[in-house]
Curated annotation (Swiss-Prot):
The keyword DNA-binding applies. It is found in: Nucleus; Chromosome. It comes from the Eukaryota. Residues 34-110 form the H15 domain. GO terms for biological process: chromosome condensation; negative regulation of DNA recombination; nucleosome assembly. Coiled coil: none annotated. Residues 9-29 have a biased composition (Low complexity). It comes from Caenorhabditis elegans. This is Putative histone H1.6.
Length: 190
């Protein structure tokens, strides 16, 4: 009888776990979004709104919800919009004219619009880039020569009469006056 008991125990041990049939899972197919990435929607909204001081987050949100299928999850839409605005400002694709973070007003950066047009030109003429850099270097050398020429007349003017020394000071004063309005216009543009 002990032999029978031994024979039964191996029978119990033999049913080991078979490989799972679930191991061959069907990969989940991701459904394509019904809308483009949020940063693209934001730039499209800002460019179409054409507000002088820039577009607010609320105006951008209204435009996006009216023109794209986003669903009913308002909290997700707001969080995605906020993150898109912050990333756009960080990557310099957007310029924040007023406010901080996701509040305030936003404009599309002028550089991004210019760079979007330039890549087609750059692809066609890659050899011209090298020539342009060479031209820039020669221009820099010429400006150095002009500075040297400007210094030599000043040395000649010093031994001259006192009237000659007064005239350069008059020239300096108008340059400062001209520089101040330029700063004001730069501040007004920004």
């Amino acid at each position: 009888m002990s032999d029978v008991a031994v024979a039964e125990t191996p029978a119990v041990k033999t049913p080991t776990k078979a490989p799972k049939a679930n191991a061959t899972k069907v990969p989940k197919v991701k459904t394509a979004a019904a809308h483009p990435p949020f940063i693209n929607m934001v730039t499209a909204a800002i460019s179409s709104l054409k507000e002088r001081k820039g577009s607010s987050k609320i105006a951008i949100l209204k435009y996006i919800t009216a023109n794209y299928k986003l669903g009913d999850q308002v909290k997700k839409i707001n969080s995605n919009l906020r993150s898109a605005l912050k990333k756009g400002v960080a990557s310099k694709a957007l310029v924040q004219t007023v406010g901080t973070g996701a509040t305030g007003r936003f404009r599309v950066a002028e550089k991004t619009a210019a760079t979007a047009k330039k890549p087609t030109v750059k692809k066609a003429a890659t050899g011209e880039k090298v020539k342009k850099t060479v031209v820039k270097k020669t221009v820099a050398k010429k400006t150095g020569d002009k500075v040297k020429k400007a210094k030599s007349p000043k040395k000649i003017a010093k031994p001259a009469a006192k009237k000659a020394t007064k005239s350069p000071s008059k020239k300096v004063a108008p340059k400062k006056a001209a520089a101040k309005p330029a700063k004001k216009t730069a501040a007004l543009k920004a």
